Amino acid sequence: MLCLRRRTQIANPMINAVGETAEQAVKKLEKVFEVLKDRNERFPLTEISKQIDVIWESVFSVTHATAPQKKYELAEEFLNHPGVVKNLLMVFDGVQVETKRKIRDLLIFIRTWTSNDFLADAEGSLVPNPRQARPSQKFQDVLYECRFIMLHIVHEGYAGSDSIGLYNDIIRIFAEDDACLMFMLKDKGTDSNEVKQKFEGCVWAIFDRLFNTHTYRGFHILAEIFETFEIIFSQNHEASQYFFYNNLSRFSQSFHWLIAANNFFIQTKSLRFVRDIFSNRYMAEVRRQWMADPSLIKYVFLHLQSIHKTVCLEAVGLLNIFVQNPCNAPPIHKLISINRKLLLEYCRQNAPNPKDENQALDELFDETITYLVNWNEEEPAHEPTAQDTLKMRSIKLKMRREHTLELVQNEIPLFPRNNLLPTSPRQSSFVYNRRLPRVSSSRAGIRFGETRNVKGSPRSRSQSPRPPTGPEPSPRTTSYQNVRFPPEDSSR
């Protein structure tokens, strides 16, 4: 970092003066917070807003542009005074929207300019790469110190409809850190002393806002609330899996209530969110348990008859996932089998017009129709028993022993180190020999494919024919009756 500052040193007194003013504003802002904390007084938001304006102008103003040298120093000055960042987040709810926007900008500025990824600008100076910037460890430590304030921000929500986007930007920065995200998902409404402060955790408070549709009616507000869900559950799949494994029953029930809501916008967003979870390859176990609930597919059938086209399309997307699943639960498989003809007729009637040129939607309907046409009404094998699992495991182990090479260690004496402790042999002391299996133990009745002769090849299989191991079966009539299962262990 010192080398970087030497290369970006600029001897412009005007720019240096502005940078020093910004650093002084940071220190002055810290003193204001400390004095008020000692007096147990409320923060004077007007004085704090003035200091924030000075710092924001020194960073983002075009007329008072600060050199990269001073921007690095200013960002590190914030990290050297973590109490300033903590107090800024503490007053985030009480200040005006314009000041909230500046606090958001400063937090993004600190994260970006203290990162480890840099690019060269037109003047040759190194500037951080905002697209691939990785937050530094010191910035993550500052965020973790502010975790209880962030929980309050997520739990209480936004002060006005025009500031919900600013709240989501703050939550996104907080959720990028794995430790902070896990702390948010584990929240149960307690403070740092494990004292119960809220009735529920911050995640369930987001559900409460969606249930209170009489208070939050604007489409932009509902869209931002669902974006909060996406920010929390799309950052780290391991943290999301932990939350789902411990709260899947309540979480799925809450989303079923949202799917059954009277607001078509909430229905559309809820179905899309569930579809995104099912499409995530890391959520295979969550998808299996959630899809086993018959109430979900009943809601899908219900919303296929909706008068709103967006709701119908999202329901078809979920139906496509159900018909593709080869291991549906018996109640789910039975429901689809009973209504297969009706579903086929519905998909054929509501398929998009080829003139619409919507390729993704056309492929969705075609794929759903194909799976419904080839639907097998017999119940699939569901949840294999423990005995079947052990039997298949022994069969795979036997096949692996018969068709793999055995590694034999050459008999080389081992000399102890200092005549006291035996040492492990070096890699060169192992000699790998090929031990061919006996003809009696090989499976002579099964042959996968025929020997192909390659003309002009010195390594042709025809030049080194395989020794006969039994009668050659006719093509496409291979019998698997010769395969014998190992005897069952009576001890199990």
Curated annotation (Swiss-Prot):
Alphabetical list of InterPro entries matching this protein: ARM-like, ARM-type_fold, Mo25
Gene3D superfamilies, alphabetized: Leucine-rich Repeat Variant (1.25.10.10)
Transmembrane segments: none
Record-linked Pfam families: Mo25 (PF08569)
GO terms of biological process kind: intracellular signal transduction
Biased composition (Pro residues): 465-474
Annotated segments matching region Disordered: 442-492
Protein name in UniProt: MO25-like protein 3
Species in which this protein is naturally found: Caenorhabditis briggsae
